[in-house]
Amino acid sequence: MAFLDQIYAVCKEHDAFLIVDDAHGIGVLGKTGRGIIEDYGLLDKVDMITGTFSKAFGCVGGYAIARKEIITLLRYYSRQNIFSAAATPQTAASAIKAIQLIDQEPQWRNTLAENIEYFKTGLETLGLDYGNTESAIFPVMVRNEHNVKEAARILFEQGIYVNPISYPAVPEKLSRLRFSLTAMHTKEELDKTFSILENIRKKYKLAQI
């Protein structure tokens, strides 16, 4: 997770424009689910916030939040916006409902936080390298293009869906299994995942810490 307070201090010192992409933080981090920016108390200080509706919101599309004049500039000069279609009514309604649920049902955020800590503990017990993630996305390192795909296949065949991430999405030798946790995952499902990982970690040479 970024040291946003330090980044903000540098930007303020040098009068730099600060854009925060909080795709993995919104709906998950912060007292009210406003993301990493709320966690650091900087909601009214960053220049622009961008993110996606495809994660915590459970739909499609994305957003950019900034002062009116900046958004107007993007509307007329951003290639991504100029050559993109407007969101459908059902997409907009879905995103609005997700925002309401983030406000009204904090228990899901709390349950996800518990699952994140539980998954961390399980991976550490197995001695697996998952980087220094603080979000619901866990990159279990494999560091081999063939092995990461085979490990993902074995997991899928046993009912666990993960994304094998390899070159060119990441540099060579940095391939990983990308686990995405939700509040709906049960402890039994997470324990099953640990059991499979324990069985395959030597054969597919999952990276150890």
List where the protein language model places each region.
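Active-site core of PLP-dependent enzymes with the aminotransferase class I/II
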Residues: 1-15, 147-148, 188
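Cytosolic Rossmann-like ligand/nucleotide-binding regulatory domains
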Residues: 165-166
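Conserved PLP-binding catalytic core of the aspartate aminotransferase-like
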Residues: 110-119, 124-159, 169, 174, ...
